[in-house]
Amino acid sequence: MRPLADEIRPQTLDDVAGQKHLLGEGALLRRLIENGTDANLIFYGPSGTGKTTVANIIARQAKKALYTLNATTASLQDVKNVMADVDTMMAPNGILLYLDEIQYFNKKQQQSLLEFLENGKITLIASTTENPYFYIYNALLSRSTVFEFKPLSVEDTIPAVERGLRIEQERSQLPFTWEEDVPRTVAAGCGGDVRKAINAVELLYRSAKPKDGGLYVTRDDALQLSQCSAMRYDREGDDHYDLLSALHKSIRGSDPDAAVYLSLIHISEPTRH
């Protein structure tokens, strides 16, 4: 059985949750995609916000051969293997390379792409959860357009959660139902990460209580699972410094009970600062 997150992945721009600033009617990225762009793109934003989904939609519309690499595991040789197919029968119209987690490529690996981006033989779509202006080589940035994906609101996430619950309902051999507030509770607890919300739906189904010959999920079940959901945070990136800055300002303002301090405690940030 396919993972729920894979089965529920949107196939069209209209199905993508949130990101109306990028994909709404008349938005720049949507127009580029619908016009069949060959531009090099960098998608920047937190996990579970649709970067990979949108890249896959672009790839399906492209007439170029699609190659996918993940920079966490790919090597320079993997990049060279992709380049070797340029102008061959494998890629007569050029190559669309989707490079996930590009921040894990070092400068030399990123530089290896430049020659082929210059001559148009390769179109690059890269995604990163880190600030691209810190982690991506300047020459690569200058040849690409950066689009920022933002965490989803609760209202944007609820339809995806409801769809996931319905799919589990269709899959289930027993009647599967849930309390009315479950979708909102799951959506509110995922921190704007749709993938996390869908994974929560899977876990709720697997842990559903027997009731009247079927399976049943309560709001309390969803709330308990949401409390286990990690807060968005990075130890060295923007979130780290934004929270510390807010902490310092709350102290200067004689507000020792500020909620931001509680956030730092929750994610176990040392208070040595």
Residue ranges and their predicted role:
Residues 2-40:
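Pre-Walker A (pre-P-loop) alpha-helix and adjacent loop at the N terminus of AAA/AAA+ ATPase modules
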Residues 33-68, 114:
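Walker A/P-loop
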